Amino acid sequence: METKLPPASTPTSPSSPGLSPVPPPDKVDGFSRRSLRRARPRRSHSSSQFRYQSNQQELTPLPLLKDVPASELHELLSRKLAQCGVMFDFLDCVADLKGKEVKRAALNELVECVGSTRGVLIEPVYPDIIRMISVNIFRTLPPSENPEFDPEEDEPNLEPSWPHLQLVYEFFLRFLESPDFQPSVAKRYVDQKFVLMLLELFDSEDPREREYLKTILHRVYGKFLGLRAYIRKQCNHIFLRFIYELEHFNGVAELLEILGSIINGFALPLKTEHKQFLVRVLIPLHSVKSLSVFHAQLAYCVVQFLEKDATLTEHVIRGLLKYWPKTCTQKEVMFLGEMEEILDVIEPSQFVKIQEPLFKQVARCVSSPHFQVAERALYFWNNEYILSLIEDNCHTVLPAVFGTLYQVSKEHWNQTIVSLIYNVLKTFMEMNGKLFDELTASYKLEKQQEQQKAQERQELWRGLEELRLRRLQGTQGAKEAPVPRPTPQVAASGGQS
């Protein structure tokens, strides 16, 4: 089903009379680039146009599969598969309308046949089926027309040949799901090269195509045991190139969704290969700029790993703290949400190992001037399981956050945040009143000492300033005083000859 997207406004050229005047450089806000950008309109940019055969023969309708005797069924099926391998130019809406309709009808019939007719998938038709699928779906994807393409703001380029391409994908899916499907026969044609080309298609901008590819690759992973390790390896390569080289790949969310299902089926104990995938691929994926596009799927994969092996918790949390965003509040809120999901499944023995660095980071988030970050961090205390972990380790957690909570409660500009902090402090006081009183007294004493030191510094600087002024006045006075002229010495004369 096509995703409904809001209509985009057409960009105005610099010479257009309706263009707003450009503000002077000193008035431009460098932080509002995203808000000033206009979403590019949806355009059809097909790669299938380069595969169009201009001198092809005109297609003619063939008899229906249900109307021929069983002895002629497979021969007619092969002819229809060959007919569906003919490509058309969909950028020209009025070209070859009859041929396009003949192919569409044939594809519809193939979809219905393979999904409902038993005994049609015999060994001789496998190469014809894979050939027809390959001709239609495998192509060089066009480069993105917008180098700054933002999936959240810009319209994707949709595939113009989708009326045919969708039916090919549907046929492929039903072919894989058919009760008559034989992986032992299909593995001669669905090999590593085929899978590699299938993975490359995940970079398509068309979300409808990526949705089909996600389901198909999952079926391939389940049917072909010999290809599983290869599929995981190639997914690793795609992610690593995305992190360290390209920083752009449209199908990351779909691939992570497949991997989430795969991780859920991993046998225990986990292999070293799987643990390395978590540490070297999934954790560094948190560092990319477009994290918001696939963060939900990524967080699911991480949590699945921790549910499989609790000993990985420390590696994961320290990795997230390493990549914690410093300037992007949107990503910071996502990190806090993922951290709460991790704490929901953490073992108490693992919590002890990471509680201090974790809650120091939570305290920094509470002190953030961005109220959404502070609010999301304070919501940790609304989680009953996290609250029980904090209560069991109150002597470590409370000293790590108390100073920040107390200070922010006096200084934060947002009254909602102040109210939430008061609730957290009240919870701590009920948990361990004695420790709370000790920390309160210690905090106040520390503040008094800081004020005393600040006052001593001010007095020291004031004394130094007075000393400088006295020396300056002394130097100026010495310069203004008259300099005595030297008296010439008279030669002694006593009448001596």
From Swiss-Prot:
Widely expressed at the mRNA level, with highest levels in cerebellum and lung. The modification Phosphoserine is found at S32, S35, S44, S46, S47, S48. Its main location: cytoplasm. One of its GO terms (cellular component) is cytosol. Residues 34-45 have a biased composition (Basic residues). Residues 1-19 have a biased composition (Low complexity). Residues 1-55, 473-497 are annotated as: Disordered. GO terms for molecular function: protein phosphatase activator activity. Keywords: Cytoplasm, Phosphoprotein, Ubl conjugation. One of its GO terms (biological process) is positive regulation of protein-containing complex assembly. Ubiquitinated by CUL3-KLHL15 complex; this modification leads to proteasomal degradation. It is found in: Cytoplasm. Component of the serine/threonine-protein phosphatase 2A complex (PP2A). This complex consists of a common heterodimeric core enzyme, composed of a 36 kDa catalytic subunit (subunit C) and a 65 kDa constant scaffold subunit (PR65 or subunit A), that associates with a variety of regulatory subunits. Proteins that associate with the core dimer include three families of regulatory subunits B (the R2/B/PR55/B55, R3/B''/PR72/PR130/PR59 and R5/B'/B56 families), the 48 kDa variable regulatory subunit, viral proteins, and cell signaling molecules. Interacts with SGO1. Interacts with AKT1. Belongs to the phosphatase 2A regulatory subunit B56 family. As the regulatory component of the serine/threonine-protein phosphatase 2A (PP2A) holoenzyme, modulates substrate specificity, subcellular localization, and responsiveness to phosphorylation. The phosphorylated form mediates the interaction between PP2A and AKT1, leading to AKT1 dephosphorylation. This is Serine/threonine-protein phosphatase 2A 56 kDa regulatory subunit beta isoform. The lineage of its organism: Eukaryota, Metazoa, Chordata, Craniata, Vertebrata.
